[in-house]
């Protein structure tokens, strides 16, 4: 991109426009629908959704819990990353997070299947990972709401068996790259 003036390098991991788009867009839409957000859960990916929405929700209500869903170290879930693997995207401000919760591939797949079966959402495995953490957070609360964004759909997972096989039949579920 440096050599070609008509090319663009977005670099979502370090581009401040990434969280800004969620701060000015996604978070505003959430607050238009809900007066209160008690917890917001997003995947630990580029950091754009987590930081942009998280910052706006904290400004609206400092008591809102901002939670990152993070795969276990060494496990690869498309769109998510473990900070323990060594890379922290430049746009991530860890001080904004109230919690960072690990999710296994197994839980991510089980929740991906539940989203389809129970809610009719043809979501991807990263959405299942985030939903698993949402359920955990909701289980800790007496009342309130937990918000999350479905960041991917299921098309790229169709040949993996995620939607057709029980988790117990998926070989190497904890060592497979789910993308």
Map each language-model feature to its residues.
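Glycine-rich beta-alpha junction loops
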Residues: 14-17, 45-48, 70-75, 84, ...
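Short glycine/serine/threonine-rich phosphate/pyrophosphate-binding segments
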Residues: 43-53, 126-134, 157
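Active-site/ligand-binding loops adjacent to catalytic centers
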Residues: 2-6, 58-125, 140, 161-179
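Active-site/ligand-binding-proximal alpha/beta "capping" segment
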Residues: 7-45, 56, 106-122
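Short, well-ordered alpha-helices that flank and scaffold nucleotide-derived cofactor binding pockets
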Residues: 32, 55, 59, 132-139
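ATP/nucleoside-binding phosphotransfer catalytic cores, i.e., glycine-rich phosphate-binding loops
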Residues: 115-117, 143-162
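Hydrophobic/aromatic beta-strand patches that form the interior of the parallel beta-sheet core
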Residues: 8-10, 41, 67, 101, ...
